[in-house]
Every structure is written in C-alpha cells, then in structure tokens.
C-alpha cells in the first residue's frame, strides 16, 4: 500500500486477514443524498420539490375559467453562513422563489380559448438547508432528522395467530396500505365469511365492495368459483368428471368407469391411486344419484322458458323440489359451484348470502352510511365518496414503491402502474386472500426488511412541503373563483405563511427532528445514521411487541444487531450497518461479492432483502485458495433466511467484509468477537457518551475504522486538493495547490479556517488544532487539523491507561474503579465544558429593563469584574454567585410617605424604583469567561461594549480577509514572476520591481503577454471581490439583530469550566465494562511492578467472568505489547542506536502475523520518515484488530515476545503501601478508558430552603427544581425498624410538609431554641379532602 507523507507519520499495524474489496462508503451519505434529491431540480418530476409542485399545480377555479400553473422554482442564497446562524440563533435557510403562471380563459369564446396570461416569481417561504455534515441549524441549534423505518406501501396478508376468537381459529386478513389515502382491509370472520373495512371502520360484507365496483351476483360467482356441470336424466344425474376434484372425499356412491366396472365402492375414501385409474380410463362423465346434488349451490339463475319465472336463483341451495321444477321446465343442464371443505371454501358464496344489497346503488349507499354515519345519502354524494376513496389521484396514491410491492406480491409481471387502485386490483387481492385461506399460499412476514422501508430527510421534508401546498391550494382556489382576476397577479393569490409554518413545524418540533447528540464525533455520526421505527406514521413504544423489536434474519448487513438503546426503545431504534445503503425505493441494500462457478470475483453487487432471499450467500470468513476458489467442499452459507451448508458450486454471492453486519460504533470495539452481545451493546452505546479529553490520545488497540470515522464525521479538516503547506497558525492553514490540480484562472491557494473553542450541543468543547507544519507535502484527503476527540486523524475518545486486574481493599467492589493520583495530575481525563448563559433585557409594562453596572444595593467587590456597560470582561475567572451581566428592572411605584417625598425632592433619590435582576453564575459552577456576544434590537442604541465588540469583529474580518487577499495576491504575483523569468527577466530585475508593477510589464512573447494580462485581470477581480466581501461582512456585523417581540437586548456569556476527574465520575472501557470512580489513590500507594512503575487503574477481576466480555482481557494483553514495543523504540532512540537497527525493528513489527493483508514497505521510507515514524511510535504502536477478523492468541503472544514481555501477560506486582509482593501474578496491560458524560458535578446537589409543591406542600424533587431527597415508604420502614421515632417524626413533618411546624422551626433556630413541635402534615389534609370527595365524611376531634 502507498502511504502519503502525512499517513507515514504514524501507521496503524493491521491484523486483518481478509483482503479489502470495498471501502466503507461515506458514512453520512444517507442524510446528504436524501436531502440533495429533495432540493435538486428533477426534470422528470418524480421527487423533491418539483414533485410536490407538480402534484398540487395547476390549481383550477371552481368555474374552470382560470387556473394557476407552476413553471419552475429556484432556491436563493442563504443570508448568513452556518457559523453566523449558530451565533445569532437563526435558522440556516434559503428563500424559495417559484415562477407561477396565471391563465384566464375567455368565457364567451369556445372552451380553452386563452384570454390573458400573467407570469410572476412568487416568494414561498424559506427552506432550511443541510450543512455539509448532514445537520440542520434551526434557531441557532444543530439538529438531525432521523430516518424512519415504516411499513412499506403495498398489500400485506396476515393472520391474527388465533387470538381474536375464543375458539383459537386463525382468521386471515389482507390490508392495502397506500402512501397516502384510505386503508382497505379484507378479513375473515369465525364463520368464514369475508368482510371489508375502510380506514378501520365498521366492517361490511366484502361483496358490497364488488357490487360497488359494478359486478353482478353472477359475475362475482364466476370470478371466484369453478363450476360443476350436471346433465339431468330421468332418475339420475350425469356429472362432468374432473378426477382431481374427487381427491380426499368419501364416495357416497359406487364410482364406475366407462365400461361399468366399479373403481371405488361407496363409503370408501378416494385416494391418489383411484384418481390415476380414473384418468387412465379416460372417464369424463360419472353417473351420480339425485340426492348427490342436494345442498349444492346453483352457479347461475335458471328461468322457466315459458313463464320467465326464476326457478332457481344463482347461489341458492338446490333441493329435490328445485330439481323436479327444472325437469318439468325442460331444462336439461345444471351448473353448481365447485366447493369442498379442504381447499375450495364457500367463502364468497356465504358472504353473498349475508349481503343485503342487490345492486350498485344500494352498495354505494351502504358504504356512504358506514363512512358518514348520520348524513342523508344521495346518489351523487355516494358515488363521489366512493370514487374519491380509492380511484382519485388527488386523494389516493400507492406511490411507485407501493405499486411495485403490490404487483410483485400478486405476481403481476409489470413493476410500473397507476398510483390508484383498479377493479382488477381489488379482485386480485380478494382472490389472493381466499387462496391463502384455502392453503395454497403463505402470509407475509411484516418484520421482513423487504416489507419495511426507510423514509429519509428528503422524503419527509417533501411530504411536509406538500401538506403546506395543499393548505395554500384551498385558499387559491377560492380566490380564483372570487373577485376580479384581471387586476390580480399570482403574488396576490399565494400566501406563503402556511407553507413556511408546515416546514418550520416539521424541522422544529417533529418527533424525528432531534437535538443533535454532539458529545463526540462518533455520537454525531451515529445520530445521523440512526433508523427509528417510532415517529409519525410509525409504531409507538407501548404497542410495539417483541417481534418488531427482535433481530430479523434480513437485518444481516443492513441494520446492526448490536447497537440499540437499552430500555423502552430497545429494538425500535436501530443503527445502519457499516456498508448498508438505501435503494431508489427506500429499501435497505447491502453489498456482496459475486461468485461465478466457484470463483470469487471482485465484482460487488448491492442486494435488497427481497432479492437476497433468492440467492445462496457465503460468509466473508470462508477459506479461499490461491486461485480465488473456495478451499472447502461444504460451505456455511445463508439461503432464504436460514443458515445451512451447501456445496461450493452452489454459492452465488459472498459477503464483502466480516464487519458488514455491524454498525460503525460496534466496529470500533476491538476483539468484539470475544464479547457477549449484551455487553457489546453497552460498549457501543457508551462510546457515544465519551467526553473529549483535554489532550486526545489515539487508542493503542483499535480496529482500523478510526480514521474513516473521524474524517467522515467532519470534525477534522481534510485537504480538498494536494499541494504544500504554505502557512500554519492556530486558526488558519494555507495550502499552495499543485499545478496539475488547478482550475483555469484561479490563484491556486486553499485557505482552511479552524474552529476555536466553541460550544457543542452537549456543552463540550469543539476546538481544532493543526497537525501539519509549513513545507509539508499534502495529498487530497490528508488530515490537516485535528478536531475534538481526534489524534492525527484517528478517532480518540479516551486515554490508554495502565491497568491491573486485582481486588484492592474493597475499593473496586461492585464495578468501582480505583485510579491513581497521577491520572488527575497529568490531566489525562480533564475535560473542558463550555456553558452559555444569557441575559435578556425586555420592554416591560413599567418601562424598559436596562443593562448597566449601576445596580442598587451591590458592593464594589461584586462589580469588580464588570466593565462600564455592566458586562463581564473576557478572561475573568468567576465562581458561583458572581454577577456576569448587571441588569435592573423597573419596580411598581409604591405610595410614598410625606417624609420620603421630601427626601426624594431634596436628594433626587430614584434608585429604589428598580430592582436587581442581574445574570449571575449558577451556584455549583466555577470557570473562565471566554466570549461575550451582545445582540441589540434594530433602533435601540448600542452600548459601549456592543460597539467595542462590533469594532473588534470588523477589525478581525478586515484582518482575515486582508490576509486571505494577501495570500491569494501573492499566489497571482508569484505566477506572474515565473512568467517574467520565462520571458528573460533576471531575478534581480524582478526583485527590484515594486509589487504593483509586476503585472504591467510588457513581454515580447504574445502568449505569455496574454497570460500576464489574464493574471492582471484576476488580480483586479480579487481586489473587487475583497472589497465586496468586506462590505457584506461589515453590513452583517453592524446591522441590528432580529430579536423576539419585546426583547431589546440579549447578552450571551460563554463560560469555560475545567473538570478534572474525581470520585463519583463514571468511566468505562469499550466492552461494556463500566464503573464509578471510588477513590483517587496516592501514587505511592498504587501497586507497582519490578521496575517500580505503578499502575494507573485497578479494576476488579470479578467484573469479567459473569459478564462474558473477554475482549477486554485480550485488549489489555495486546495493549501491553503495543506499549512495550513503543518503550523499546524509545530506548533505542534515547541510546542513539543506528537508524538501520531502528528501521529493522519497526519492519519486524509490521511484518508480524499470519496471512496479514497489510504490507508496509519500511525499506522504501527515507531516513527522515523512519525517524519521524519512530518518534510517533514512542508512546506505543497503534494496532488494528478488525471485528471478526482480528488478531489471534498466537499473534498476541508474538507481539508480547517482540516487546520483551512475558507471554502470559502477567507481572509480579508489589503493594505500594507495604512494599510486599502480592501472592500471585497479576494481569497488567493497557486498556482504552473513556470518561462518560455522567459527571458527579452535574449530579451532586444539596437543598436548604427551596420551592414546595402547591398541593402537597412537600419539597419538589430533582436538581433542576432545587428539590429535596424523597424519603419514601421503604426508608420509613427502615427508621421504624430501628425504632428511631423522633428522627422519623421530624422527617415526616417539619422537614417535609408540616407548614406551620417548619415556619416555627425556622424561628426557633434563629432564636437559638432547639425545640420542635410537629403539627399536621399537609398531605394528610389532602388525603382527607380526597376521602370527602368520595362522599365519606371524616372529622378530626381534638385529643
């Protein structure tokens, strides 16, 4: 493999044995592609905004004399960029402008004669835009729209599993689900009649539906039944024989062949052998006794030819009398319905008998009554209602997916078709459910991923936009029908408010629009790849059963079987598997390698769950010989959702990678294959809660996916094009682009601005640091700067800690963790949290609030950190209770005494009219002010601080743009100088030229002269562009802010809090091994090895066996080897050994392992590169052990040998307190530990006096309400058991809800009297009132 200059800085040793056929696709593509389809103009009009417009327009007036047509749309440019939107608290969106055409038709002339056409561009609200990282900025906060897994439109057949009826009989049902419109259900009842329901309302016999579709009784019978033909003879009947129909029946008469010999005697059961005999003898007719026909049903009406009287009506039961009537009337032939108990049920026949309607109108009226109970039906209303239910494109749409699923399920060859239902569709569904009831077909599995599809951002936004358009449509139609249209323009007809409101509602408050989890890069990526079955049109937690939540065979390679939340949402919220993607229909697909005649090719095909069932698919870990053939004869594979063994020749596809089945979070767990699934689930979920540490450190033992994840998450800065690093500082990187990657006529400079110390959604700190230096070569895709939780472009969620598995004085009882003081001293788990505190000055009824440093009754010391405007300085260190922003609020005028009036008249004392409502630091917080933002309403005078901040921003913008301009100008000038050198100018001449004159030289060579002129033009454009950009920036900074009504000013203060690790903080490894820190132990007391090196953390070995997450033990051994190799390299460098020796050792490390795919050609590295690599490996060599394809025990032992460590992985340890050796050896190594965002500082809380609940008068609960501790029922029992009567009494009275008692208590304490008199608890009064409300009077007597 070829490594770029920056990749050579540190190479992760990979133990993967399988060749890489396919790289993990871009992780955020599910979000970005979906939204791109929504906003991109689609000429076919099948998706996105275009589809929404085409589905609603043209809008015709009621009279048909005018219509509003849609022509095209365009999205404008957003006013503010993403960062500005976040600071100002506005939505990152672009204005949508639509070109509409109003056509007026001439009433007097022939139909369709156009009288007037008006075209105009109309503003239709703002559409939120997606940022490059797949998020939306809504009101200043980053949000993610989670994709939804919902039941695909189409037709589904199911049964009730015998739960509906007491007999336990299985009742089948069919349901046609459209994308939008009414649901149509068919279901059997316990008596085997077929019923229909529309939108889950009252059920009607299914034949009513057929009658409404203009089928007569005769046609219905012909559709659903075969006939049995009889010829009527004098005493007998002759039946046309279809031998197959007799199978399984008991003969009620002798069955004879054509010659008259008896084949089956009366009373015998007819078997397949008998049927073969009948077929052999070519018997086509069979004489049956007259009684045989009794109880059969007529297949048609029989009419007396003379009188016209109906002798036997269709579907009526035939009796001997009926037969006699038919003979008398001279009717010689009779047809009955072919029905048998086994596989030709009388379902439709029975249904017809309970159907009270006889014609179409009656059926329509019946449906109307069911849909609109209480309304008088008219013929037109009933027809219109039925037509609109399933046959109107405006009200009903199966969608392309629905039609495809519908046709495939009913074996209709074409995948395309109408979006509405046809008569034939409904009949086909009824035939199919009867087919299933007869036992010829199976019901569907609704949890199969072929029956559930993904609805992503673009599709949901399109649906919401359509909802808004439909609201507008009604208003437009009314306006077109009213008023004089000659005066109106399209602008006057359209009101953009409903559209904006629908879109805003979706992005702001939909259940699937979620506040982005921004703890670390992994949590961001996982949140964007989340698939939820909840939300509008989905399931609800309460109703979702076990089956829906369970892992289904079709999840393989599509949804991760590991990563899902614990708790009520388990299995309803899933994560996309690493390689999965959605197809054009929204079904999940996963890639497979094609296998042709037993040879595995590198051709990759994506298969959906439906397609996968048809093929035989082998796993990725099968043995492959040198020719790319399968080495074994019998191969473990999957076919039709079952695991089985098949011959190598039968295999059609093979997995692309062993990591294919799991999500990115799960594939970050090394040695995942050795962990129990429950613990792996916790490990995957807890990595998302890791807080970025002060100095990120890459994991020594990783899985090789760390880099992909860090790059795709968007937190690191990646080079867009190759070149050389020209300039680096903490906030900007400049890359000079390679000549061959330049676009014509550009300066050839890429400038990357870095994000510095900004706040994330979870209050963690986002900060980017450059990881390249000037002069370094860069190729496209190289990491230039690290973000939070990344280290040289690798994801780094925690720290590598030296761990010992041993008990230590009970401090690691029940998963507690003992850590060394050194960990805290070295700031290994110190994290920075940034809090945003806001102070809002409003306009009140009594006057405006004012932000000022002049606050009544506050001492000088409290104001020492404020400037003259009353706002805290940047850099000030503040603690709980300090004033950040001084604010005074007008108080109501109180009635003054004459003396006060006199004093006020003399001294002009007015300060008592305002009260102090300043913004203070919350009690438990202590930190440093890192930024202040002041927003002032338009028209309100800006205070001095606001002006200063504004000037600072303008100066910063001028400096930034100026430097950018200078860099780009230098790029142009250097190219011009190169031209002049080529034209014969000497270096000295060029050096003597002033900068501005370089571009106005005259050259003899015409082409070069033209190039020089082009460069001069470019320079002018740059200058003009700079002025324009600066003007826009200046206008943005100085313009007033758009604040909420009644708000004059908002001051936002950003406070950085440094949190070191302390007892009570939660920590975890990557294998679900979590615990709380119990004690920070002095370094000298920690166990140490023979070299005197103490361990950092002591974990309880009892946490491993019962949890079955052995991966952590292997990680510790591998970590020890990796660190040991790093220590060896360090020793070599410190002893200044020969570089060849260092190179040889590093080469030995990278070549270790059996059949390892990775090849690192250390020999091709220059000495400088080897030295730099060695320096970066001093902390330990990073290792990749991919899930299901990782390092084996043998390789871990080889690594330990290379590191010069015992292959047992265990060391002698000594007790730090006594110096004695522990009685047996201890497993010591390096584990990657995470600090989770469950910090004791956020949870610890104490209450003195605070708020009480209004009804019970008891203290509230929880930190947010400054509440107390609940002393519950069991705690009361505990005190009762100890006989602590007085403690119990005060707990239940004065410390809780005895209102008078607690006031008296306070007074007593103030007076120094420590007595207490408990009274009646308020909750007892509540109980009395409750009992009285039930009508039972209780009165209290004085004792």
UniProtKB/Swiss-Prot annotation:
Disulfide bonds: none annotated. One of its GO terms (cellular component) is DNA-directed RNA polymerase complex. The keyword Transferase applies. One of its GO terms (molecular function) is ribonucleoside binding. InterPro entries: DNA-dir_RNA_pol_bsu_external_1, DNA-dir_RNA_pol_su2, DNA-dir_RNAP_su2_dom, DNA-dir_RNAP_su2_hyb_sf, RNA_pol_bsu_bac, RNA_pol_bsu_CS, RNA_pol_bsu_protrusion, RNA_pol_Rpb2_2. Its EC number is 2.7.7.6. CDD domains: RNA_pol_B_RPB2. Keywords: DNA-directed RNA polymerase, Nucleotidyltransferase, Transcription, Transferase. It comes from the Bacteria. Pfam families: RNA_pol_Rpb2_1 (PF04563), RNA_pol_Rpb2_2 (PF04561), RNA_pol_Rpb2_3 (PF04565), RNA_pol_Rpb2_45 (PF10385), RNA_pol_Rpb2_6 (PF00562), RNA_pol_Rpb2_7 (PF04560). The keyword Nucleotidyltransferase applies. GO terms for biological process: DNA-templated transcription. DNA-dependent RNA polymerase catalyzes the transcription of DNA into RNA using the four ribonucleoside triphosphates as substrates. The RNAP catalytic core consists of 2 alpha, 1 beta, 1 beta' and 1 omega subunit. When a sigma factor is associated with the core the holoenzyme is formed, which can initiate transcription. PANTHER family: DNA-DIRECTED RNA POLYMERASE I SUBUNIT 2 (PTHR20856). This is DNA-directed RNA polymerase subunit beta.
């Amino acid at each position: 493999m070829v490594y770029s200059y920056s990749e050579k800085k540190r190479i992760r040793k990979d133990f993967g044995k399988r060749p890489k056929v396919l790289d993990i696709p871009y992780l955020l593509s599910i979000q970005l592609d979906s939204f791109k389809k929504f906003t991109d103009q689609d000429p076919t009009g099948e998706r996105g905004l275009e589809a929404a417009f085409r589905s609603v327009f043209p809008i015709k007036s009621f009279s048909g004399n005018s219509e509003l047509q849609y022509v095209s749309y365009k999205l404008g440019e957003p006013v503010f960029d993403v960062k500005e939107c976040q600071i100002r608290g506005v939505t990152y969106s672009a204005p949508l402008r639509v070109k509409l055409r109003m056509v007026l038709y001439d009433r007097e002339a022939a139909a369709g004669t156009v009288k007037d056409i008006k075209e105009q561009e109309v503003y239709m609200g703002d559409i939120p835009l997606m940022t490059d990282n797949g998020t939306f900025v809504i009101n200043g906060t980053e949000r993610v729209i989670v994709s939804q897994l919902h039941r695909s439109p189409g037709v589904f057949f199911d049964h009730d599993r015998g739960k509906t009826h007491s007999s336990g009989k299985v009742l089948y049902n069919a349901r046609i689900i459209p994308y939008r419109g009414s649901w149509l259900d068919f279901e059997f009842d316990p008596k085997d009649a077929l019923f229909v329901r529309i939108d889950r309302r009252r059920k009607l016999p299914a034949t009513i539906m057929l009658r409404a579709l203009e089928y007569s009784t005769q046609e219905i019978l012909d559709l659903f039944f075969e006939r049995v033909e009889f010829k009527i003879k004098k005493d007998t009947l002759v039946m046309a024989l279809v031998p197959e129909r007799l199978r399984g029946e008991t003969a009620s008469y002798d069955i004879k062949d054509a010659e008259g010999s008896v084949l089956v005697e009366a009373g015998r059961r007819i078997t397949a052998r008998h049927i073969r005999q009948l077929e052999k003898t070519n018997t086509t007719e069979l004489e049956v006794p007259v009684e045989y026909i009794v109880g059969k049903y007529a297949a048609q009406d029989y009419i007396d030819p003379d009188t016209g009287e109906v002798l036997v009506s269709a579907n009526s039961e035939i009796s001997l009398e009926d037969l006699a009537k038919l003979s008398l009337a001279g009717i010689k032939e009779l047809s009955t319905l072919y029905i048998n108990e086994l596989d030709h049920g009388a379902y439709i026949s029975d249904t017809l008998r309970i159907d009270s309607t006889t014609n179409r109108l009656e059926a329509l009226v019946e449906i109307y009554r069911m849909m609109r109970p209480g309304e008088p039906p008219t013929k037109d209303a009933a027809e219109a209602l039925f037509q609109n239910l399933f046959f109107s494109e405006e009200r009903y749409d199966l969608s392309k997916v629905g039609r495809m699923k519908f046709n495939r399920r009913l074996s209709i060859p074409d995948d395309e078709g109408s979006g509405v239902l046809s008569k034939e569709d409904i009949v086909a569904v009824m035939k199919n459910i009867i087919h299933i009831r007869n036992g010829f077909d199976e019901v569907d599995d609704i949890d199969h991923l072929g029956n559930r599809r993904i609805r992503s951002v673009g599709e949901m936004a399109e649906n919401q936009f359509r909802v808004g358009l439909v609201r507008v449509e009604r208003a437009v139609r009314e306006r077109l029908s009213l008023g004089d249209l000659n005066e109106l323009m399209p602008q006057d007809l359209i009101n953009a408010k409903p559209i904006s409101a629908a879109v805003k509602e979706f992005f702001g408050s939909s259940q699937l629009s979620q506040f982005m989890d921004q703890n670390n890069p992994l949590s961001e990526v996982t949140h964007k790849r989340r698939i939820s079955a909840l939300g509008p049109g989905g399931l609800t937690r309460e109703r979702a059963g076990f089956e829906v939540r369970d892992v289904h065979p079709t999840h393989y390679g599509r949804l991760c079987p590991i990563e899902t939340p614990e708790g009520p949402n388990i299995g309803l919220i899933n994560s996309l598997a690493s390689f999965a993607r959605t197809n054009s229909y929204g079904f999940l697909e996963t890639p497979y390698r094609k296998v042709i005649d037993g040879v595995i090719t590198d051709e990759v095909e994506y298969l959906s769950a439906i397609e996968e069932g048809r093929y035989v698919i082998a796993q990725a870990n099968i043995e492959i010989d040198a020719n790319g053939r399968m080495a074994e004869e019998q191969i473990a594979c999957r076919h039709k959702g079952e695991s089985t063994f098949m011959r190598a020749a039968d295999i059609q596809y093979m997995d692309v990678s062993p990591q294919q089945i799991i999500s990115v979070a799960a594939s970050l767990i090394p040695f995942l294959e050795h962990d129990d699934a429950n613990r792996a689930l916790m490990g995957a979920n807890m990595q998302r809660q890791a807080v970025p540490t002060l100095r990120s450190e890459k994991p020594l033992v990783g899985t090789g996916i760390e880099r992909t994840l860090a790059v795709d998450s968007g937190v690191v800065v990646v080079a867009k094009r190759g070149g050389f690093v020209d300039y680096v500082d903490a906030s900007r990187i400049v890359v000079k682009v390679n000549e061959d990657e330049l676009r014509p006529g550009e300066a050839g400079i890429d400038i990357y601005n870095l994000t510095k110390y900004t706040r994330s959604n979870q209050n963690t700190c986002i900060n980017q640091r450059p990881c390249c230096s000037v002069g370094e070569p860069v190729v496209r895709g190289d990491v230039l700067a690290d973000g939070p939780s990344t280290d040289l472009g690798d994801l780094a969620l925690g720290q590598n800690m030296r761990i010992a598995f041993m008990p230590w004085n009970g401090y690691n009882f029940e998963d507690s963790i003992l850590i060394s003081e050194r960990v805290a001293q070295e700031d290994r788990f110190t994290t920075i949290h940034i809090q945003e505190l806001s102070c809002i000055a409003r306009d009140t009824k009594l006057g405006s609030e004012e932000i000022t440093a002049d606050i009544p009754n506050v001492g000088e010391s409290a104001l020492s950190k404020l400037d003259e405007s009353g706002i805290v300085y940047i850099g000030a260190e503040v603690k709980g209770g300090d004033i950040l922003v001084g604010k005074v609020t007008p108080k109501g005028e109180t009635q003054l005494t004459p003396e006060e009036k006199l004093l006020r008249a003399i001294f002009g004392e007015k300060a008592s009219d305002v009260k102090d409502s300043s913004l203070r630091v919350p009690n438990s917080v202590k930190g440093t002010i890192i930024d202040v933002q002041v927003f002032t309403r338009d028209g309100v005078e800006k205070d001095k601080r606001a002006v200063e901040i504004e000037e600072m921003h303008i100066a910063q913008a001028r400096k930034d743009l100026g430097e950018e301009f200078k860099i780009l100008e230098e790029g142009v000038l250097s190219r011009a100088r190169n031209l002049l050198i080529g034209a014969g100018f000497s270096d000295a001449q060029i050096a003597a030229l002033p900068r501005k004159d370089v571009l106005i030289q005259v050259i003899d060579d015409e082409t070069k002269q033209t190039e020089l002129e082009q460069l001069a033009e470019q320079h002018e454009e740059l200058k003009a562009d700079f002025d324009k950009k600066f003007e826009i920036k200046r206008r943005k900074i100085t313009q007033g802010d758009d604040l909420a009504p009644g708000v004059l000013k908002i001051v936002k203060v950003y406070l950085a809090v440094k949190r070191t690790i302390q007892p009570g903080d939660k920590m975890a490894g990557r294998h679900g091994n979590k615990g709380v820190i119990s004690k920070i132990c002095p370094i000298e007391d920690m166990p140490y090895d023979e070299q005197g090196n103490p361990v950092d953390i002591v974990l309880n070995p009892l946490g491993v066996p019962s949890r079955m997450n052995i991966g952590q033990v292997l990680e510790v051994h591998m970590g020890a080897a990796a660190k040991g190799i790093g220590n060896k390299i360090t020793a070599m460098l410190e002893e200044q050994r020969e570089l060849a020796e260092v190179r040889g050792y590093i080469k030995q490390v990278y070549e270790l392992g059996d059949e390892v795919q990775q090849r690192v050609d250390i020999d091709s590295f220059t000495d400088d590169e080897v030295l730099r690599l060695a320096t970066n490996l001093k902390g330990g060599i990073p290792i990749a052990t991919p899930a299901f394809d990782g390092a084996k025990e043998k390789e871990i032992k080889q690594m330990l040998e290379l590191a010069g460590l015992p292959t047992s992985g265990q060391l002698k340890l000594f007790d730090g307190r006594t110096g004695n050796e522990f009685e047996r050896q201890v497993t010591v190594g390096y584990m990657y530990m995470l600090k989770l965002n469950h910090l004791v500082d956020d949870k610890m809380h104490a209450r003195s006096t605070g708020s009480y609940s209004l009804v019970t008068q008891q203290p509230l609960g929880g930190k947010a309400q400054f509440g107390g501790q609940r002393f519950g029922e069991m705690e009361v029992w505990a005190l009762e058991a100890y006989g602590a009567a007085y403690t119990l009494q005060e707990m239940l009275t004065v410390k809780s809800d005895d209102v008078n008692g607690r006031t008296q208590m306070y007074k007593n304490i103030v007076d120094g009297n420590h007595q207490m008199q408990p009274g009646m608890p308020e909750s007892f009064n509540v109980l009395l009132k409750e009992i009285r409300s039930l009508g039972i009077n209780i009165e209290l007597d004085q004792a």
